[in-house]
Amino acid sequence: AMFREVVPEQAIKLQGEGLRAVLANRYLLLIAAIACFSQLVEPLVEYQFLSAIAERFSDTEARSRFIGSFFSVMGGVAIAINVLVTPVLHRYLGTLAGLAAQPLNVVLATCGFVAQPGIMSASVMKIADRGLSYSINRASRETLYINVDPLLTYQAKAWIDMFGYRTFKVFGSGLILTILAFSPAARVGYDLAWLTLLICAFWIAAVVVLGREQQRLLLRNPRPANAVP
């Protein structure tokens, strides 16, 4: 009985505090922005990937085999990047280079998909998105909280991970439905690709602004970022 009464109240309080922490802190707001842009792009890339598979394989069993093999490869790529690439990139180019790696690679892969649509280019685009999201992007994003007060980190991460991710993923799905409703069938893939490029442009811009904000914090306030106007 005690848990049924206390846990919902704590969850509501945490959600409110997390949102207030993000909105009141420019640094945390930028962290939330890059995390949410990542989730906004995911359903767009996923739709194009699954559409390419459906076009290539008419047999359900063949699709299942391909998807199973693909995700095994993508998991291996993510592990290899985390072990071999992420430490080197962070050491020589810094955290922001790690944050920029995913949107830049998604841009390149999407351009390849626009130039040559098909299952191979769609697979490369999927790996550029989720393969880097599960490895270098996540590792880079976690290091951003080092300069933040632990309580603010707890509140902000709770909101970003539990609410922000889901909200923007749903919003991304809504964008797909909008494209499907208003674009000719032959242009859906291209329109989704161009929309992906547009979101990545805002994503990269947010990373650049975040880098400047991080430098400003380090120069003006070496202490944890409790309150950034």
Identify the residue ranges that each predicted region occupies:
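Membrane-embedded alpha-helical bundles of multi-pass transporters/translocases
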Residues: 1-229
